[in-house]
Design a protein with these regions (language model features):
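Cytochrome P450 catalytic core segment centered on helix I
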Residues: 1-59, 265
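Proline-centered turn/helix-capping motifs that create local helix->coil transitions or kinks
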Residues: 1-3, 33-46, 62, 129-134, ...
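Conserved cytochrome P450 K-helix E-x-x-R motif and the immediately C-terminal K′/meander segment
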Residues: 28, 112-146, 167
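Cytochrome P450 catalytic-core helices
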Residues: 81-108, 204-222
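Cytochrome P450 proximal C-terminal region
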Residues: 110-112, 200, 205-266
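Conserved cytochrome P450 K-helix/beta-meander segment immediately N-terminal to the heme-binding cysteine loop
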Residues: 142, 158-185
Length: 266
């Protein structure tokens, strides 16, 4: 997060001037895409995030303005950049310190029929190493929580990371076990790396897809080994959790991945 002093425009060579210039360039790209998408004849049939936002209306039937759409897209892309990269760092750290899981993932990517195990690895990573450990919410009506009376309007911060470490929900919760997600038995409010409810993270689907795709490409293509004996400790950086020293990986050689055979399209 940039300091207000750095965001301010102090002249042509200042960081603030570069920030404003790049922000305007990003705005132009996003607004052009919004305008182009509004003209698409098949908008009603599209299921991507932007199309869903374009069709969304509030309680009074009003759609989102271009400025509101731009802000949502910028939030999704900008806020998701660091968080997704951090989630991937956690994934590599956990996989490299669990060689049997790494070997199974590589085999499933190369020979499996679907992405079930790959998706389970991503979900288990974000359960054991969530990038965001709390989500602010404002109570719309009074609540009693553990004997405490909380009036409407109070801000609460559910400890998402603690929920995901409950032994009654996740047996052997401190262990990295992706197979626990293969049966998709996790309760809706027991897996919360993106929050929950109507204010769940807008970029959740994009982040999951990005993490899966990076692992799909990187794992079969390289022989990877951990540099340290144990996974890196987790620390709080600004509002996100991250590996304390970063995740260092040793690449011993390039592999020739055995690609999963393509399924003919009829």
């Amino acid at each position: 997060m940039l300091s207000p002093l750095l965001r301010a425009d102090h002249g042509p060579l200042s960081p603030g001037r570069r920030f404003v210039r790049r922000l305007r360039a990003a705005d132009a790209l996003l607004l052009a895409e919004i305008a182009r998408r509004r003209r698409e004849p098949d908008l009603e049939n599209r299921t991507d995030v932007l199309s869903l936002l374009l069709r969304a209306v509030d309680d009074d039937g009003r759609p989102m303005t271009d400025a509101e759409l731009r802000d949502e897209l910028f939030t999704m892309l900008g806020a998701g950049h660091e968080t997704t990269a951090t989630g991937l760092a956690f994934a590599f750290d956990l996989l490299l310190h669990n060689p049997e899981t790494l070997a199974r993932l590589r085999s499933e990517i190369e020979h499996g029929d679907d992405d079930a195990y790959l998706e389970a690895v991503v979900k288990e990573t974000l359960r054991l190493r969530p990038v965001i450990d709390a989500a602010e919410r404002t109570l719309t009506k009074p609540r009693v929580v553990a004997g405490w009376e909380l009036p409407a309007g109070v801000k609460v911060y559910p400890a998402l990371a603690l929920v995901q470490m409950r032994e009654d929900l996740y047996p052997h919760a401190r262990e990295f076990r992706p197979e626990r997600f293969l049966d998709d038995q996790a309760e809706s409010y027991a897996w919360l790396p993106f929050g929950g409810g109507i204010r769940r993270c807008l970029g959740a689907a994009l982040a999951l897809a990005e993490m899966a795709e990076v692992l799909r490409v990187a794992i079969p293509a390289r022989e990877l080994h951990p540099v340290r004996d144990q996974p890196d400790p987790v620390v709080l950086r600004n509002v996100t959790l991250a590996p304390r020293r970063g995740v260092e990986v040793e690449v011993s050689r390039v592999r020739q991945p055995q690609s999963r055979p393509l399924t003919p399209v009829s």
